[in-house]
Amino acid sequence: MFEVQSELAVFVLLMLVWTVFVLYSASVFTWFVEVLVLAWRQTVPADDVAYGYDDIQVRIITIDAANIVQSTVNAVPDGLDDVRVIAEKPISVDGATVHAVPEEFTCTASHKGRALEWARREVPCDKEFVLYLDEDTLMANFEGLPEGDIVQITELPVYTGSWVTYLSEVFRIGYQREQRAFGRFSFPLYAWGGGIAIRTSLENRITWDSKTITEDTDFAWRAAADTGLDFNVLNCKFRNQAPPSVMTMLKQRRRWFSGTRQDSDLLPLHYQMFLQFRLVAWGFSPLIPLITLITFLVPGALPDLMVYRIGSLLEFATLFVVTGAGVASYWSESKLTLLAVPWTPILVVLNTAGALWGFVSPVEHFAVTTKVPLETVEKRNPAFEPGSLTKHDGRNDLPEHLDMNRFTSEHRESFHIHDN
């Protein structure tokens, strides 16, 4: 009896191992096709401008984080004068017109989507584009917009106090290089709302009035279903904040996974199947480093599967390739991201654990990711001097210049190491 149970346990384990292996192999293959083939020459350079500042209205979405929003407004380039703040509560922000969403306003959308929909209806706009920013997004290298119905702007998160989450973001940015290929798809697989420009006529036709917790992806999918969507990626490298803690990051990833999965019925059947396969691979990807480690450190844990071991080792190596892509994205702005490379296996597990959490226990309500005042970021981040963030002009780039003395002293303090 015990022998039968043992054989059954091995069979179940083998099925799990091979299922994860096949799913992740297919996911890795499609990522390489997207990044190396489909994304070739698809990114629009920051200086490829068809619409200038006079054609753009900026809208910054917040609940009531006046100090965070003030820094975002301060970074808007001079000459881009039509700046609006859409807030859930009345706040005061210099350099922008603040609009508070009335408490009595109701629509199908909720939370951030509700604010977006109210602004679409009530905030006057005679510009060709509305450029949406999250409350913590700092514009950079921005000269204007190219042609397109939706223009996705690239991002580079900054360190805000947690090296784990910052380096995890480096891995995410590497994986997100696939987004440069989305212009070749009928339906972009996802969108990032921290820096996204939408043609005003398209916004008014599609509206934000939809029940979702991932508003930007939901909007892009409904727009693509309504008409042939011209989706472009503009390589400006806007700076936003890495989550300040691991738990905040896990909750963020859980919401992204849950919202994308819940909205997938907006897609045609073949896109739904492709997306679901990607989501499952994403959700279970934390198992790849663990299974690979077990098969090599505990040879007797599984029957002798040489093909699997070689394949899993190659998959393991691709994780470092993704991290390398993230480092390459940051390279002109920061060399500090090289720290992510040796920590890749741990970063993969942490970065995707939130997706697994969302797979097991989906969330249905929007939650705001905690933000850190820029003055605090400048104190914590050894790559930024006081004023480099708070006085930044969004027309310029925002490189990081690492102060090694600050970097090493802060690490000594964090590990309670003191000079004699």
Where are these regions (language model features)?
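Juxtamembrane C-terminal module of membrane proteins
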Residues: 1, 21-54, 83-85, 89-91, ...
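Short, well-formed alpha-helical segments that are part of the catalytic scaffolds
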Residues: 39-46, 64-80
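Cell-envelope/extracellular polymer assembly enzymes that use nucleotide-activated donors
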Residues: 54-59, 82, 218
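Acidic donor-binding segment of Leloir-type glycosyltransferases
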Residues: 73-107
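Short beta-strand-to-loop acidic/aromatic patch adjacent to the donor-nucleotide binding site
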Residues: 125-140
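Catalytic donor-sugar/metal-binding loop of nucleotide-sugar-dependent glycosyltransferases
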Residues: 221-239
